[in-house]
């Protein structure tokens, strides 16, 4: 990742359910982790019920419950001000998940044009992108990638780890 990067965005996009039935409610979230690979406090987990991190460095555009916020662009966005991240945070893991996927019997393979991407928020240059519909067709949650500190600069690593166990499994993994 370029050294001069100060602000990144994580965009999640998808099309509304055109086939009837339950809406597809995809969510973008972030776990801000300390040295022990856990969130130091609950407010370092940014999601629909906590739209701004404790340090104010990560914020959410809000919860789009249908995929109808944009015609072809991002429906939900996380914005990260890298210069404002608390010194105790060593990495930020970005997640795409389907709300109540098990109850609604949904997975990414059913959601048309679903993607998650990370980009330089100052230039809009895309750094990485996953097509959720194809790459994670049977999953309900994806650990997309992580920003991590190395020698006082932020770097990005794609992860691409999908699961059928929902966001709850990652809350158990990353929360103290």
Model regions: which residues?
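Intrinsic-disorder/low-complexity signal
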Residues: 1-176
């Amino acid at each position: 990742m370029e050294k001069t990067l100060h602000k990144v965005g994580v965009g999640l996009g998808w099309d509304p359910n055109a086939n009837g039935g339950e809406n597809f409610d995809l969510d973008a979230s972030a776990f801000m982790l300390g040295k022990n690979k856990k969130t130091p406090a609950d407010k370092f987990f940014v999601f629909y019920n906590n739209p701004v991190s404790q340090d104010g460095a990560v914020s959410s555009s809000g919860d789009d419950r249908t995929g109808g916020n944009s015609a072809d662009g991002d429906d939900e966005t996380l914005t990260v001000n890298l210069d404002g991240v608390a010194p105790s945070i060593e990495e930020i893991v970005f997640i795409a998940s389907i709300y109540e996927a098990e109850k609604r019997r949904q997975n990414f393979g059913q959601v048309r044009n679903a993607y998650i991407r990370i980009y330089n928020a100052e230039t809009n240059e895309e750094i990485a992108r996953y097509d959720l519909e194809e790459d994670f067709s049977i999953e309900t949650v994806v650990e997309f990638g992580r920003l991590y500190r190395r020698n006082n600069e932020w770097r990005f690593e794609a992860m691409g780890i999908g699961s059928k166990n929902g966001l709850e499994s990652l809350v158990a993994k990353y929360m103290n």
